[in-house]
Amino acid sequence: MASNSGNDSKNTLYCSFCGKSQHEVRKLIAGPTVFICDECVELCMDIIREETKSAGLKSDDGVPTPQEICGVLDDYVIGQAHAKRVLSVAVHNHYKRLNHSDKSDIELAKSNIMLIGPTGCGKTLLAQTLARILDVPFTMADATTLTEAGYVGEDVENIILKLLQASEYNVERAQRGIVYIDEVDKITRKSDNPSITRDVSGEGVQQALLKIMEGTVASVPPQGGRKHPQQEFLQVDTTNILFICGGAFAGLDKIIAQRGKGSAMGFGADVRDPDSKSVGEYFKDLEPEDLLKFGLIPEFVGRLPVIATLEDLDEDALVTILTGPKNALVKQYQRLFELEDVKLTFTDDAMSAIAKRAILRKTGARGLRSIMEDILLDTMFDMPGAEGVEEVVVNEEAVNSDTQPLMIYAERKADEPASAS
């Protein structure tokens, strides 16, 4: 018997790439002196597809076309067709301007971008995906942490420092990068009337951002300015850096609605239910004057000529977000359960119920993970200690009530086929 087991181990074939045996994979393909398994083949195909996609995103002048940019955005961001078109055209024109700046006497001005939309609708993801497509340095900054120079908080120059760090201190690359400033709606004026007291985190930050957004040579301290005052400064020209500002602008829809009401009154007036339109629908009618009333200063709005408004995500879009993208939430949790040798299944009704809960919470796609955690918390707590669990099924009852997801055991599966339906 010992000799037979020794022969079996000698005859066992292994993948030359990952080292798995023929018994651990579905298929092992033989080549001259090497073997490759089906899992490694799939991995190689994914790598080739990604490289082909990024290599294909180049037109004759080295800049992806708007259609190509929009096509890749579709792979990562669900919905928001109008915002994708606006972004694709603006980014294409920006990098085309950079590549042809020396070939004409006409100087093309930069068009920074403002993204306005409800929370959890994909503003940040759009900016991150753009940077990935174009292979340029990208950094995100939180506007709420910024203050005027000389006050407690971060200086505006720290944004350029983060971009330098993302480009590994290559100044030339950093000068063609993308900066995304989030929560820009939180740096609005505290009131419409100018005050005798300084607004160092609101209007003061807008004033400080004006120069770097328009284009200036910023003196950037490599280690941060306030802690190391004696260091040498790096000179970074911000003229060709693309700035994208994003914010939820809570309450802006009311300003837009008020502007559209007019002065009609009496029996002939058009009476509308204030809840009949969503926030995203109001944003479609946005005018620059609405942003001024919200608290942005005219000079700041003028530095952001391209405005893309995003819509609320409906039920179908949220269900697609749960299952569609490469790193979809459902796939993430299924992988977690796979590590416990348990199959996780969601019914179609459960998906719809999760999407409806996210809409009621008004948290957009960002709230989906919180809902999934609530549903699966007790199951994930009990499952590692439970023996024989083969499958967990999440149905509509588990989403809408305190009912736990169904746990199907291996020895009971033949006796209880109806419990999973």
UniProtKB/Swiss-Prot annotation:
It comes from the Bacteria. GO terms for biological process: cell division; proteolysis involved in protein catabolic process. ATP binds at residues 118-125. Residues 3-56 form the ClpX-type ZB domain. One of its GO terms (molecular function) is ATP hydrolysis activity. InterPro entries: AAA+_ATPase, ATP-dep_Clp_protease_ClpX, ATPase_AAA_core, Clp_ATPase_C, Clp_protease_ATP-bd_su_ClpX, ClpX_bact, P-loop_NTPase, Znf_CppX_C4. Keywords: ATP-binding, Chaperone, Metal-binding, Nucleotide-binding, Zinc. One of its GO terms (cellular component) is HslUV protease complex. SMART domains: AAA (SM00382), ClpB_D2-small (SM01086), zf-C4_ClpX (SM00994). Coiled coil: none annotated. Zn(2+) binds at residues 15, 18, 37, 40. Component of the ClpX-ClpP complex. Forms a hexameric ring that, in the presence of ATP, binds to fourteen ClpP subunits assembled into a disk-like structure with a central cavity, resembling the structure of eukaryotic proteasomes. HAMAP family: ClpX. Belongs to the ClpX chaperone family. ATP-dependent specificity component of the Clp protease. It directs the protease to specific substrates. Can perform chaperone functions in the absence of ClpP. This is ATP-dependent Clp protease ATP-binding subunit ClpX. It comes from Jannaschia sp. (strain CCS1). The gene is clpX.
